[in-house]
Amino acid sequence: MRFRFVCRCPGRGLICFMLLLAVCALSGGCGERGAVEVDDPGSLPEPTAANVIPEPTAASVIPEPTATSVIPEPTAASVIYEPGKTLEERFLVPDGYGRKKREQGTLTAFLREYPLKKAGKPVLLFDGSRKGNQSAHAAVCRLPIENEDLQQCADSIMRVYAEFFWQTKQFEKISFSLGGGFQADYNKWRQGYTIRVSGDTAQWVPSSASDGSYQSLKKYLRLVFAYSGTATMEGETKKIAREDIRVGDVFIKGGSPGHVVMVVDVCEREDGAKAFLLAQGYMPAQEFHVLKNPRHEQDPWYYEEEVEYPFETPEYTFDRGSLRRLVYNE
């Protein structure tokens, strides 16, 4: 479209022309196109650094979750609380299980409160050297051990019972078989007697060195350890079913060599199924220690449904009929 300017105002042509230019400017300029349409791509300005939205960069993109930012799933290792100083504090129960309330003065309470060495400590032999196999234990108990090769597997369990009965003043229950029908009653020892062994015969004889002190208890145990073992211990047990397992029970194979491990804690599910911890001494004489479970080494609990025979522990495999209860755990 073309405009033809005709001014009919005499003497005012310049003024009228200037007004016409102003009108054209307000209407988008002069020419055939008129105003620029915004939907006409040919009329959009070329992009510049100032008006382009920047592409996302590594710093501006929300990162994908990584292994360190994702909350880990619970694992079997979560049942071990390394700062724990006692059996109960160190070993948490598995999901779905709970410990029954422990009554003071019971073997369960005694063992749950039993002090442990710091996590990661090695098992030491009676002479202070390291045991060769350091991969079998989950914790080391602070059970006393003397500087001689006597307190081995059965002896360690007798030591646990003797310490418990002595501390709770149940002296009449400290009594162990030496074989051949001879029973080493600690109460008799406390009354001023000792045991004389000659060949296969043992008998009580008076002794001024025997009394009710703790030092005298250790002398009594030293003699018991020298003349007893898994064979005599097995004779003081009875078979039990796995669903009846409780603290103080044992898996035992009597003989020479034999072996025995002890149940030191038990927890239960609501349906009554149990899980338990095992501990042992061994030969040569060594510190009493909580065992790992070879089925899942990061979780030391043994589960009732896993008890099948042969029953495997880290350093010994037990046959059917080995789960038993000691007469002094009645």
Kindly give the residue locations of the regions a language model identified.
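...with weaker cross-activation on analogous glycine-rich loops/strands in unrelated enzymes
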Residues: 214-272
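Intrinsically disordered, low-complexity proline-rich tandem-repeat tracts
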Residues: 45-47, 54-56, 63-65, 72-74
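Bacterial N-terminal signal peptides that target proteins for export
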Residues: 2-17
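Low-complexity, Gly/Ser/Thr/Pro-rich intrinsically disordered linker/tail segments
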Residues: 274-330
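Bacterial N-terminal signal peptides
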Residues: 16-27
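Extracellular-facing segments of soluble proteins and assemblies that are Gly/Ser/Thr-biased and enriched
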Residues: 146-238
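N-terminal module-boundary/linker segments of secreted carbohydrate-active enzymes
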Residues: 34-46, 73-133, 147-152
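Bacterial signal peptide processing site
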Residues: 29-33
